A protein has these predicted regions:
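Beta1-alpha1 glycine-rich phosphate/pyrophosphate-binding loop at the start
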Residues: 3-96, 198-199, 268-274
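A conserved short coil-to-beta-strand element within the FAD-binding core of flavoproteins
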Residues: 98-113, 306-323
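Central helical "cap/lid" subdomain
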Residues: 141-156, 321-372
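C-terminal active-site-capping segments
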Residues: 397-400, 404-508
Length: 508
């Protein structure tokens, strides 16, 4: 099947790209999604308590405010409903194909097109390929000795078993990150015994979450400018946090203030000094993702809950043995161990010029130009590519910035009748050299921890090291001067002989 634009992934990024393409009059596109429905991470993560840690008004498209958010921080089901409504309102759903897992893509240098294969044997040919798979799509499974021998249930939070009956069971949760602080309070309410296995404590702040009054929602619906103002205020409030992550001497005190707030919250929430010591981080705030929760500490102090800080020696058929020799028996093990975020920017094999594979190019860490294009891979765009995620604000803002850039580039490709456009290697290298210098000064590099922001060697491939408005300014237009633009060969008019036969030329 031939198509102008092929988008892989139907989450916030893929759906947003489809909407903007339609608004630009570029209707010849398809969106391939491996799941049975749209939503991306909000379709995958259905565990109890799943919710966003970015305010609702900001975690949405700027062109489609939702006056009916029920809470300041929306839950998974409400976000998924919002995305489904957007797909219908903007007419993108007919462009979507579900259960189409992409297993490979190869660039045809002769034709200037991408050939994309799916798991079910289909092949799509497209002039432009857009990867919108995001960075939270490949669960990270811990390499624990004996895990396969466990006779109870084992599953990852991103692959939640809706049929799992955990009431009155003995359950272990491995991990204490963003998903754990949401699921632990929910599980603690219904299981017989809950063990939370912690390797490194996280910095936890209270979550400023509450129900949004019906009257407030009504005013937002009636006066759209009020909600836009609320969104702007949330944006500014979160953007102010960015300097605290940059860790330059000028801004160090802001980070220390946040640490004091978190420690005060811990002191007030946890009475037991031994437990409090176990929950006190030994690295700078922001080095790992800051956790927001109002009930995580309370859940850890329930009579049926324990925090285990001894390392896991092995998993046995009946439970877990820790390094201190203790044997823990369980009916189920829940893996709240996050995603391979630093390693999944190439979620399927992508082969560019000369057959070079993107994953192989990135074996020492992903790099791109503005997180969106890669030299050697013409007519290829990424949404939420390398170094476009955030430690302080909404990635939807970044996604929309990239979409603006990509749509402008596609218009350039079509308007100038170009065969290919490809970022110059020297431009990409210079951009990443400056980026590495900025990242080296951030708390993510200097804060004394190793996080999912980094590769195994410590290279930070996920986060943008600055203000989001700087990124948006850089993405406001397609900078064609930094690209190699290859036009189609000029077409010679076919010569027609007297007998009406067409001589070999462009038409042959």
């Amino acid at each position: 099947m031939e198509i102008d634009i092929l988008i892989v992934g139907a989450g916030f990024a893929g759906l947003g790209m489809g909407i903007r393409l339609r608004q630009a009059g570029l209707d010849n596109f398809l969106i391939l999604e491996q799941a049975s429905g749209l939503g991306g991470t909000w379709n995958d993560n259905r565990y109890p308590g799943a919710a966003c840690d970015v305010p609702s008004h900001l975690y949405s498209y700027s062109f489609e405010n939702n006056p009916n958010w029920s809470r300041d921080f929306a839950g998974q089901a409400e976000i998924l409903t919002y995305l489904e409504r957007c797909a219908d309102k903007y007419g993108v759903r007919p462009h979507m194909r579900f259960r189409r897992k992409v297993v490979g893509a190869r660039f045809d240098e002769g034709r200037g097109t991408w050939s994309v294969q799916t798991e079910d044997g289909r092949t799509y040919t497209a002039r432009v390929l857009v990867s919108s798979c995001g960075i939270l799509n490949k669960p990270s499974y811990p390499q624990l000795p004996g895990l396969s021998t466990f006779q109870g249930l084992v599953f990852h939070t991103a692959r939640w078993r809706s049929d799992a009956a955990l009431d009155n069971k003995r359950v272990a949760v491995i991990g204490t990150g963003a998903s754990a602080v949401q699921i632990v309070p929910e599980l603690a309410k219904k299981v017989q015994a809950l063990s939370v296995f912690q390797r490194t404590p996280g910095w936890v702040l209270p979550k400023p979450d509450k129900e949004i009054d019906v009257a407030v929602r009504s005013r937002f619906a009636k006066h759209a400018w009020l909600q836009k103002l609320a969104r702007l205020m949330q944006y500014v409030r979160m953007e102010v946090l960015a300097p605290a992550l940059l860790r330059t001497p000028k801004w160090l005190e802001m980070g220390r203030v946040a640490e004091r707030m978190a420690l005060r919250y811990l002191d007030e929430a946890v009475a037991d000094p031994v437990l409090r010591a176990k929950l006190t981080p030994g690295y700078r705030i922001g080095c790992k993702r800051i956790l927001l929760s109002n009930d995580y500490f309370a859940a850890l102090q329930r009579k049926n809950t324990e925090l285990v800080t001894s390392g896991i020696r092995e998993v046995t058929p009946s439970g877990i043995t820790t390094e201190d020799g203790t044997e823990h028996g369980y009916d189920a093990i829940v893996l709240a161990t996050g995603f391979k975020s630093a390693e999944v920017h190439a979620p399927f094999p992508v082969r560019g010029r000369g057959g070079e594979e993107l994953g192989e190019r990135w074996k020492d860490g992903a790099e791109a130009y503005l997180g969106t294009t890669v030299s050697g891979f013409p007519n290829f765009f990424m949404l939420l590519g390398p170094n476009t995620a955030l430690g302080h604000s909404s990635v939807v803002y970044m996604i929309e910035s990239q979409i603006t850039y990509a749509v402008d580039a596609i218009r350039t490709l079509r308007g100038r009748d170009l065969k290919t456009l490809e970022v110059q290697k020297s431009v990409q290298d210079a951009f990443n050299q400056r980026l590495r210098g900025r990242l080296a000064r951030t708390v993510w590099a200097t804060g004394g921890c190793h996080s999912w922001y980094q590769t195994r060697t410590g290279k930070i491939t996920t986060l943008w090291p600055g203000f989001t408005f700087e990124f948006r300014w850089r993405m406001r237009r397609f900078d064609a001067e930094n690209y190699s633009l290859d036009p189609f060969p000029k077409r010679e008019p076919a010569r027609v002989e007297s007998r009406g036969q067409v001589r070999p030329g462009v038409l042959s």
